[in-house]
Amino acid sequence: LTVSLNTGEWHDFMLEGEGQRLVVPVDIFLFVNGTIIPGGEIVVGEEGRLAGQMMTTPYTTEANLTLYHPDGRSTAIDLPVLEGLPIVNGEEWFQKMDYITSVCSDSTECGGYINRWMGSGNPQFERAAAYFKGHFEGLGYETHMMRVFDHGNPTQPESLNVIAWKEGRNDSCVQGMGAHMDVAPPGSLAGTYEGAYDNTAGTVSMMLYARAFVDLTFECDTFLALWSSEEEGLRGSNAFATNDCDYCLPKDKELKFYINMDMMGISWPAHKANGDPFPYHAWSGPDFDPNEQDVAITDVLDHVHRNVLKAPMNLTIDGSYGSGCDQHWDEHSNLVMDVHEDTFGRSDHVTFRDLGAQTIFHLGAYDDDYDAYHSPTDTLDNMVSEVGGQEELEKSIEFVMWAAMLEFLIADQTPEIRNVGV
């Protein structure tokens, strides 16, 4: 019997014998009872048997495991690694993107969930929100449509969010992940109808995470959210954070961390037409002192990219990118992997950062590096064209989706990640 591992997939295992200790490489993850085990090491207790799962990444190439025996001996276990279908993958992301943004007479082929601008009682937004809510509900999440009217006109809802909750082990804390589902409203010089990059891409990422997280167990109560009104000033996430309702952000629990997905897919490893890689932005916060690391989630951000995914952290281009981080831009302007602590705002992570949560913000290329967002050219076809084909886009989005997912899983089991106000 030959045992192998497939990239990006789950693999069941069973260890027998008290004191047996299994150690795995940094890019293979152990889960017991649905929870990631930090450090990649487990020991069989007095019960004499331990069942769990291993998860590889799409980029795992070797599986060199070591089993340490109670008598001091050890056994090397080298398993072949085969190409698999990752639990979160670019191909499924693209299929869902294509369905949501396509318009045709066959509803099985085209969802037509476009024109999702917020603030005018838009029936297209209502229809899309109901579709997204149904996705989370169908997976078994406690899901709510959150409406807030704060100007007295019910035909112009201030915000309409989709909030999916997953109960954690610890009732005293809360954490979350989200993306805004609204698109820039139409105007004479701006506006979009697909909003493929900004932010159908992040919305679909959240849909895939919800499926991947169904059978996992987290430390804290966890919200997976699709925000409205980001384009009108973060009103959706602010409504969730500041209002009192059964499914709003609880005020009596410690808000530990939040990860935000906005404008996804146009980033390294995809390349521009001139051959340069697109910049890759991922910023942690709060960043109180640009000369010091302020928060523990920065260690998770760096570890995932540098050690687990083995990203080219020192890769540079000749010249300079069009835009990037707030801090350190003078020394980072030509850096492909713009991954560090920073004060950068402009999206829904600011809502939670202002409440003391440690945050990570994933953002693709923007402004001079890719300026199609907030315009009629923000389409899936344009994204494909800009990166040189569908396969390249799928590779690009798959990398950042795995980075954010691993950050979330590891942060969940990192006790040092606390609200900075504690």
Question: At which residue positions do the language-model features occur?
Answer:
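Aromatic/hydrophobic beta-strand junction motif of beta-rich domains
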Residues: 3, 13-19
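Short, hydrophobic beta-strand segments
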Residues: 48-59
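N-terminal hydrophobic or amphipathic helices/low-complexity stretches enriched
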Residues: 68, 72-125, 166, 420
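A non-catalytic alpha/beta surface segment that caps or lines the substrate-entry region
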Residues: 102-167
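Alpha-helical metal-binding/catalytic segments enriched in His/Glu/Asp
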Residues: 164, 177, 182-234, 403
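Metal-dependent peptidase/peptidase-like ectodomains
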Residues: 227-359
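His/Asp/Glu-rich mid-to-C-terminal helical/loop segments that flank catalytic regions of hydrolases
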Residues: 363-422
